[in-house]
Amino acid sequence: MKKRDKMKMMGILILLLAVITVAITLILVSRLSKTAGKDQKEETFDRSVSGMLSNAYILKSEEKDIIVLYRGETYFAEGKPEKKYTGVADIELTKGKVTKIYAKPSTIKGVLTSYSSKSVQIEGYEPLSAEKDLPVYLVASSGHAKIPVRQGKISDLVVGNSKVELVVAEQKACALVSYQEDMAEKVRVLLKNGKENTYASLFVCSGDAYTVDGNKRKKDTVTDAEKLLKGEKTGKEIKISPDTGGLLYRCDENGNPYGSGYEGDLILRKEKKGYVLINEIPMEDYIRYVLPSEMPLSFSYEALKAQAVCARTFTYGQMKNDTYARYGANLDDSIAYQAYHATTSYEVTDQAVADTTGMVMTYKGKLADCYYYSTSPGYSENLEVWNAASPGYLLAENHTREKTKDLSSDKAFHKFITAKADAYDENSPYFRWTATLSAKLGMDETYGKLKKLKVNKRSTSGYVLSLTMVFEKGERTIEKENEIRYALGKYLLDLDLADGTNKHRASSVPSACFEIKSQKKGTIVLTGGGFGHGIGMSQYGADAMGKEGKKWQEILGFYFKDVTFTNVFDLDT
């Protein structure tokens, strides 16, 4: 055979092999695509593997076709199932083949009300101890989903909202299966007892008739948590519901209310250290009360609408936060989340919420992380102040006419903070401020008396990222924005604001955007600007933009780059 013919024959063979390879690949892909997706791998069980797989999910078991989801991976297995079965099961393997399927059909159905690393609770039931690393299976609501079942985490579920099946064996939670992927319509707010999460005693009353776990109570009747929950196990909940239009109050044992009442239901929950009080309320009603708690009624109407969208976006973003999952709550009523003063609703804020019902901010199809604060010094900040990576929609930008882009040097920051600025926030009393610190106001337990401060590092927005406090007996370096503000607050004697007002002994300096003006004889003077962390939407800035005629979408688009606005129920969860 000539060399040319040999080369031709070799080319044909290579082409034929390529075609065969592509064909085989297409066959495998077509088979795998029914259960596999980008986030789940496809495997076959190794022939050397024998033993038991606990709490796996059987996707399919017909004749010799067995498909198993286990620890996030999809396996195609050989075997002869006794009958068709889909769901959670223990699987016996012998040399890589399925030899027995032990179905686990025993389930508790209901709403997930609480969870921790050791237990899970379904509404109406006591908490059950849970398997370590409890598997959670999320079943798609559509039968045409590319991934019909995927393995998730329990934090993918929403306390007080997610409808689940808890798989139980030998009085222990083995797995959770969720069939619902809708966005939450209710929020559970833990009502704190000052800085504590629990109450030693707890009384509830109402000016109207109400029900306690379905049992009618007359108006002005006092419900005592201790009497209801005495002898009950930890985690036991009692739901108190008002009659239509009624409010529920926390009160003393004689029925004298503490503050204003709450819409929605109050849930009394027994814990080891006392009782937890939770307000379960529809999402939009919660936003109605957050809005006037977070923004003055006198602010422009478009700013109020922007704040409503911010508050709603933030709340939905917190629904899967597991901080209070053990108590059966999504968040609390403190400023650590959002101020929630369930006092009085107002027509203007109610209307702002109604006009933006369900609207949230999204970025690339996902819910955006929404942050807001009182006053910008004229330069927005990103997550650098929290030592975290920033998403593309949160940028550090100069919002004054002075377009200096980098304020990380002391010289550039001094020029910025002392210049007359033209900014949206300039009418805020916190736009510029002077803080006077006195070493006489505090004594560090370890290092003694405060001597001086040193700024080690600034962000490009001018915010202090690293501050060293020099004491008589040593030094302490702080590198978190909030900790810097409150550490200095211990020594804060006077705070003089831009509108001429003075605040004596405030709890913290308004922001970490400051310079050290002077320090001598135990007195340190700071010059700064802004109030809050500086990330996201400035409320005073939003007010000014609204008064200029800008719509809420423009306001939010100014502070959050390239975001879109979507009804939360249209989101792909």
Listing of model-derived features with the role each one plays in the protein:
Residues 2-573:
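Conserved, single-site charged/polar hotspot
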